[in-house]
Each structure stands twice: as C-alpha cells, then as structure tokens.
C-alpha cells in the first residue's frame, strides 16, 4: 500500500504535443539513454530486470559498468570493431546491463526510497517469475538482446509494475518531456508519456537489453558479428526473470543497484 502523500495528475494527453506527419519507429532502448544532466535534488530510480552470472559479467565488460557492484569494468579490446567499445556503448553504459521494467523516475510528493522499495517488495510477492528466450537483434538501429518468441507473461508483469508504482512517480518536467522528443512519437506514445512518464509502456513495451548506441548500417553489421562471438555460450536459454531490482542514479548519471525483490507469486 502506498503511504506517502501524492497528488494525482491527469492522464489525458497534453495538448502541447504535435504529431509529425510520419512518426519515427519506436526507439525505446535508446530512449533510456537520453539523460544528459542530473539534478541532485531529484534522485532518480528505475526498476530493472537484471541478468546474473556469466551473462551479466559479459554485459558489464561490454558496457564498462557493473551496476550490481557499482564499479567501472575494463572493456576488452575486441578485434574487428570499427570503434572502441567505450564509444559504441557510451550512453548505454551508464545504465548497466539490464532490461527496463519501470523507466527512471523521480519520486512524487513526500514519497521516499523506502516507499518505493516497500511497494515493489509487496508487488513482487504477488508476481510470478517469467522466462524469456533472447536473441541478438539490430533491426532498430542499435544492438540489443530482445525476446525471440511470445512475451505475453512478460508484458503482463511489466504493465502491472508500471501501473502499481506510478502513483509514486513525480510528474515530468517540461525539460524532461522535451528530451523525449514528443513530436516524433505516435499519439498513443504521447499519451503514455503523459500518463506513465515513458512512451513505451503497456502494449508499446518491448523488452531490450541494450549493447550500443544507434549505429550506421555498416557498423551495425560488423558490431553484431563481434558481439555474437563475445556472448557465445553466455546467454541463458531461457533467461529466467525471478527478481526485480531498484537502481538509483548517482551524480554522474550512472545507475547503482539498491535492492532486489524476488518474484514469489
């Protein structure tokens, strides 16, 4: 139960959004990587599904940041890459190796971290673990692990978390809305941005474990081949998501693990 005091906001789409003639396709993985400055007076928290074991270790090495341990990791020199990993995964590395369930947010009213943790812990006690078969994809101009098959259970889990935690979320500032480039979103995505602070929620949700920035076609093909070799035999089949984790952004915008809540339903 939410115990902090928050004022409820309207969930209707804002009239300031103007639809472009041809909205661009969803780029939800890169949308997580658009923060350029961090306001120390508005701590940001996110709820992630985080890989474990050698898959997580490989991902931390690729990105150069271990969000579980809260430390930088030496990125390997991988022959064949067109650029160093430090450039290919520059912004993605801030967030760690993860799949977003509830996008980074500030907390509303007098809500504090304990309220978020307790609410997620209670929620996870009622949610079931889910299994996802992953494949390496590059069809949205960046490289990411994404589901290879049906995701109905995963969609339900993510939607439940987004809805149940949203009363804790502070309303987006004008600057945050502008950063999302709402003119490039579909009308439905604009509505979700206003309602949940993120345009790729509910039916627009698409799980992704991001590896790179957006890349040109020729680079993307090369990097994909190198990544396939690097992650070979390290990707769980399937990936069992049996806990959800809260991460907090530091003053540099890097995310650190705070708590993990097991799915016990």
Stretch-by-stretch model annotation:
Residues 4-16, 22-24:
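Low-acidity, Ser/Thr- and Arg-rich intrinsically disordered low-complexity segments
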Residues 240-248:
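Small/polar glycine-rich anion-binding or flexible loop at a beta-alpha turn
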Residues 28-139, 152, 156-238, 251-265:
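Basic, often amphipathic N-terminal segments
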